[in-house]
Amino acid sequence: MKVEEKAGVKKLEPTSYRRRHPEQDFPSIHIGFPVPGYSQRKSDSKGHLSGLQRVQWSLQPDKSQQDLAGPDGIKASSLGGSVDFTKRIRSPAAEQLQDILGEEDEAPNPTLFTEMDTLQHDGDQMEWKESARWIKFEEKVEEGGERWSKPHVSTLSLHSLFELRTCLQTGTVLLDLDSGSLPQIIDDVIEKQIEGGLLRPELRERVSYVLLRKHRHQTKKPIHRSLADIGKSVSTTNRSSARSPSAGPTLHHSTEDLRIRQSTSYGHLCHAQSRSMNDISHTPNTDQRKNKFMKKIPKDSEASNVLVGEVDFLDQPFIAFVRLAQSSMLGGVTEVPVPTRFLFILLGPSGRAKSYNEIGRAIATLMVDDLFSDVAYKARNREDLIAGVDEFLDEVIVLPPGEWDPNIRIEPPKKVPSADKRKSVFSLAELGQMNGSVGRSGASAGGGGSGGGAGGSGAGGGGSGNEAEMPAMHEIGEELIWTGRFFGGLRLDVKRKLPWFPSDFYDGFHIQSISAVLFIYLGCITNAITFGGLLGDATDNYQGVMESFLGTAMAGSLFCLFSGQPLIILSSTGPILIFEKLLFDFSKANGLDYMEFRLWIGLHSAIQCLILVATDASFIIKYITRFTEEGFSTLISFIFIYDAIKKMIGAFKYYPINTDFKPDSITTYKCECVAPDTVNTTTVNDSALLVPNTNMSVYTPLNLTALDWSLLSKKECLSYGGRLLGSSCQFVPDLALMSFILFFGTYSMTLTLKKFKFSRYFPTKVRTLVADFSIVFSILLFCGIDACFGLQTPKLHVPNVIKPTRPDRGWFVAPFGKNPWWVYPASILPALLVTILIFMDQQITAVIVNRKENKLRKAAGYHLDLFWVGILMALCSFMGLPWYVAATVISIAHIDSLKMETETSAPGEQPQFLGVREQRVTGVMVFILTGISVFLAPILKYIPMPVLYGVFLYMGVASLNGIQFWDRCKLFLMPAKHQPDHAFLRHVPLRRIHLFTLVQILCLALLWILKSTMAAIIFPVMILGLIIVRRLLDLIFSQHDLAWIDNILPEKEKKESDRKKRRKEVHENTDKEPQFLPPSVVKIPMEGIPSDPQNGIHCVGRKRSSSWSHSL
């Protein structure tokens, strides 16, 4: 088949240098790529180019050296040499792609499910058999069994892509065809082929007969059908063997066999009128509707069908690419009941089955490519499709055949590069292709990714220009803009949050919310009990466990109902506990009333918080970069981990392991209760006393002298003044070891069940359910283990009566009457420290929660959050309850428990993180349950405390995930060759990274020392000190380094942005036409690739160079 040039395909002969072999003269592939001129500054190359600059694929015959100079006088030296030129190379394909892909107003195109069917012959019968399918990655039908292969990355030969390009150039292309059935589509395609002289009219019925054969799909069959098929296949094989002892498999693929059998089959076409030409049903069959694979296909998807095969009656390929105007159900053509939008048909002469199959795989792979699928949907003509293929060729990676086995299936990557990056690349300065850039940018590939694949460049790939290597600027949301108006920020927060208020409730009705509520509830009550007990010891029970429970329930529920960020969980913190202890000691030493003094400090602090809200003081949070965020969150995580381990070690001290126990001396071990020397003979009425083996009522008055002290229990003996005597009296079962099993078992089981989501066992929904309820399952499991053993491990004790811990105080604190008048104004000074502490804790936690990595779509409310924290502080001060502020670790755990991922993902594709389920229901339910925990005390008393310590440990460890500081700390222990491919490691020297990490470690150590001493009262001031330290780092590190390992401070960002803007204006005024080097040329001999003119699919040779000369 002769390859003809089509309209709109222009011949472009770039000026290039080519080195000729002294003894050979043969056609060559010239792979050219434009290089930015060296006279132009690199920093000026970004964003000033129009058109899509592409890698140029050009097949041209050898020319004399004089012809290479070009009509414009452009001269080229050897590859990589400096070249002067004055004209920019622009390709028609670049303009086409820029026009059709530049429209961003349209809705995204549906996901394409692509199925490839190959023509199979069984005797006189023919059918289309499904051989492969794609959603994102390729799945093949295994030849040795009725099963699908694992999803894998499609590996295509470069030659098949060239042949596909030729197919689109020479075949029939029908765009927006208005047909609703397969016979009608085939009739239109055949008619178009006959009109174009590509098919002889007498072959119409033969081609139509082949294309309308039934399709057999690789679907899962019931077990009874599978056994029946096995028996049928065995009997068929026996009959075939009886007819011909040398007979091969049932399906014949050899050319000779096909020719003989097809001639017999087509001989029956004369009787076509007596039987149907169409074997395909118009509606989906039962197998299609029941196919479970439909769950993997996104909603509103469309299908792309690829049909390839070989026949003996064609002397040139029958090629057609069809795009329907509206997707239509084509009956049994597709494996699943998905409407078809695209068809690619390739029927060719016999003997090239493998070549046709590779071309089919190539077009199928392109159809599921994000960018080419957009081109296919928006293409206006044939040239647009060819331009899409050329863009795909720009991104193709070629592996040397001697270094890679194509039979090895490449596992799908964990992170796939976004197609948006490719779509936005319309200039060479931003080109992040594998083949499109050289020089310095090629050495620093993958600007934004954490790996080669993620960055789009990997090893050996071209990166961006100098400016493109910089990461995204530190984005400051509009919530932190200083308005300059009285309560301006608060009013804007309210306006932003009001539209989302109804959805904050109905978005919470999801099964995932149940797991989040139980997880955070257990963390909150554990924290409330621990903090309440410590606070009771520090304040002589003026504030205890009951006050902690009531304050947590009231403050937390009100905050989650009305705050700007309801995902934040309020709790008490260590610095507040230290402040309360110092305040109580000061009041006691100076004869002041502690509760009244504390009330005035809380009122002043609340007023100061409201002043900060009124003046939009929260805008200074934009100066908190990753350096401060990660230092603060890492410190809180370490506190959780340290406290959990410390409490576990305390169990070993309280219940020591019996190292002196000797099993051989068990007969000498005894313990008995001995009566005291003098016993009061008066009677005792004690309901707790129960003498074993007697019928004595528990309420019967007892005479202690009449008791048999040897029958009393340990508790009874000690309560009535008796003494324990014996060598085994100090024996304690190994409660410490059992507590450790419960503690570490809960932590490790939770961690394992969380990772179970990414295992290979059980269906996706089961794994997701187990991962979401991992905390609940772990707690229930180890509570059951503790109950089975029946050991007296420490249990959770919750007050069962709502009353103040101290009997001489009530639920309201009077503001006057117990302290001198000067105490009221003097409390402003300690209130200032509390305000700094509250402000920093609250806003740093809010910044961490509102990170862009969490993909929160509802607006934040920094001013509204601080407003409610101030109001709640005043309310808690009047009621004598603890003060509450945002809890970093529990808030991060709340975020993690509400993360959403794609419900349907393509086989082999990792679930994509969609964001967080933003709502108020979980927070409100957590604190309501905390409040009614008093009535749940009979149930909660069965929960061992070591289990809750394990939950604490998990919270601390889990909150360290995703912190870059922790990743950089681990680099100290890794050799360079084993270090992960983090993005910052590509752009910042390792010694600079270690220096930055050491500074953070020193700051963290200083904060830890302050927290552990009485100087913890100045802890909030030291948080402010972190911001100062970060500003001083600008004197040590460059802005480039800080951009990768931290964030650039706002004023630095503004200066950088202004500098770029001025430079852009100067560039636009002085240099409207950026210059490029002429394409450098690599000569690839084509002598070993034979052309076969008979089938019409081949690489274009000496006289067909224009078919390939698109400068892309």
Curated annotation (Swiss-Prot):
Compartments where located: Basolateral cell membrane; Apical cell membrane
Residues in compartment: Extracellular: 537-547, 621-734, 793-820, 876-880, 941-945, 1011-1015
Biased composition (Polar residues): 53-67, 233-244
Name this protein carries in UniProt: Electrogenic sodium bicarbonate cotransporter 4
Family under the similarity heading: Belongs to the anion exchanger (TC 2.A.31) family.
Catalyzed chemical reaction(s): 2 hydrogencarbonate(out) + Na(+)(out) = 2 hydrogencarbonate(in) + Na(+)(in); 3 hydrogencarbonate(out) + Na(+)(out) = 3 hydrogencarbonate(in) + Na(+)(in)
Compositionally biased region (Gly residues): 444-465
Cellular-component GO terms for this entry: apical plasma membrane; basolateral plasma membrane; plasma membrane
Any Pfam family hit: HCO3_cotransp
GO molecular function per UniProt: monoatomic anion transmembrane transporter activity; sodium:bicarbonate symporter activity; solute:inorganic anion antiporter activity
Topology of the protein relative to the lipid bilayer: Multi-pass membrane protein
Predominant location category: membrane
InterPro entries found in the cross-reference section: Band3_cytoplasmic_dom, HCO3_transpt-like_TM_dom, HCO3_transpt_euk, Na/HCO3_transpt, PTrfase/Anion_transptr
Region (Disordered): 1-80, 220-255, 439-469, 1055-1112
Naturally occurring in which organism (per UniProt): Rattus norvegicus (Rat)
